[in-house]
């Protein structure tokens, strides 16, 4: 199981003071050296953390691959076609949210999202869709003919007790259903060092995308060590 390291919150720290440090370029390079299988970043419409120039500077630097998260809107499509990352993950976006809340609604916005997805695919960019672990959403992703989905694990991360167990079961069932349909399945959102274990044990997940928890852990043990520790946990539980 691969680890995609999200470096958005390195940029959050930088933007808090409007400085040119900490460097997202250094963060990406060191994360790769520590075992990251890909580098994930989200260029939001409000530019609250990542900036356009970050994409252009990072793309030639990366030794693994860039997984660029974007809202499915024309402005972001234009940027993605110009930067041409290996992967684009289409995500929902609301300006007032702290972070991405929930998955895309592929039922309500099917045609708009499919149009953006098709444009990216035709340009040679691999597309994934960030969706809730729900069968009806997966069916729409299959209908769109995308190769990858990323399952939203936020409810699993937020819930406790029986609700958490129910959400875990939904994720397990969604992975199994999507895999049978030939989709590559990633997962992420809200995962950290204490809750990633049960997700890592799910057979069929290709990659976990994790950022905030790694940045937070790095404050105490260092950036590379934080990546190494997360990678170690995922590897241990994925094989158990």
Where in this protein do the model-derived segments appear?
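Conserved N-terminal beta1-alpha1 strand-loop-helix module at the mouth
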Residues: 1-69, 73-85, 166
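Short beta-strand/loop segments at the ligand-binding rim of alpha/beta enzyme cores
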Residues: 1-3, 60-68, 116-129, 177-187
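Hydrophobic faces of well-ordered beta-strands that scaffold small-molecule active sites
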Residues: 3-7, 39-41, 66-70, 88-90, ...
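Glycine-enriched alpha-helix->loop->beta-strand junction motifs that scaffold or abut catalytic
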Residues: 35-37, 61-63, 82-88, 122, ...
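C-terminal helical cap(s) of enzyme catalytic domains, especially alpha/beta-barrels
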Residues: 59, 102, 163-164, 217-239
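Catalytic cores of alpha/beta
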Residues: 74-83, 134-144, 187, 191-205
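Glycine-rich phosphate-binding active-site loops on the catalytic face of alpha/beta enzymes
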Residues: 89-97, 148-160, 204-223
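Histidine/lysine/aspartate-rich catalytic loop segments that bind and position anionic ligands
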Residues: 126-177
């Amino acid at each position: 199981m691969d680890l995609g390291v999200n470096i958005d919150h390195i940029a959050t720290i930088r933007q808090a003071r409007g400085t040119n440090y900490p460097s997202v370029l250094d963060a990406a390079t060191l994360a790769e050296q520590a075992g990251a299988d890909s580098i994930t970043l989200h260029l939001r419409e409000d530019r609250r953390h990542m900036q356009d120039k970050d994409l252009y500077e990072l793309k030639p630097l990366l030794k693994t691959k860039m997984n660029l998260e974007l809202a499915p809107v024309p402005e972001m499509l234009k940027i993605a076609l110009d930067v041409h990352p290996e992967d684009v993950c289409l995500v929902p976006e609301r300006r007032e949210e702290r972070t991405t809340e929930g998955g895309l609604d592929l039922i309500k916005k099917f045609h708009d999202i499919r149009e953006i997805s098709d444009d990216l695919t035709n340009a040679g960019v691999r597309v994934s869709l960030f969706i809730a672990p729900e069968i009806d959403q997966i069916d729409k992703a299959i209908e769109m003919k995308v190769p990858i989905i990323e399952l939203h694990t936020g409810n699993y991360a937020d819930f406790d007790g029986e609700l958490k167990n129910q959400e875990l079961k939904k994720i397990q069932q969604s992975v199994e259903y999507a895999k049978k349909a030939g989709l590559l399945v990633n997962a992420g959102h809200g995962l950290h060092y204490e809750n990633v274990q049960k997700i890592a044990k799910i057979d069929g997940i290709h990659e976990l995308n994790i950022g905030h928890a790694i940045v937070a852990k790095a404050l105490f043990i260092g950036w590379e060590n934080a990546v190494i520790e997360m990678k170690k946990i995922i590897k241990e539980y994925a094989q158990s």
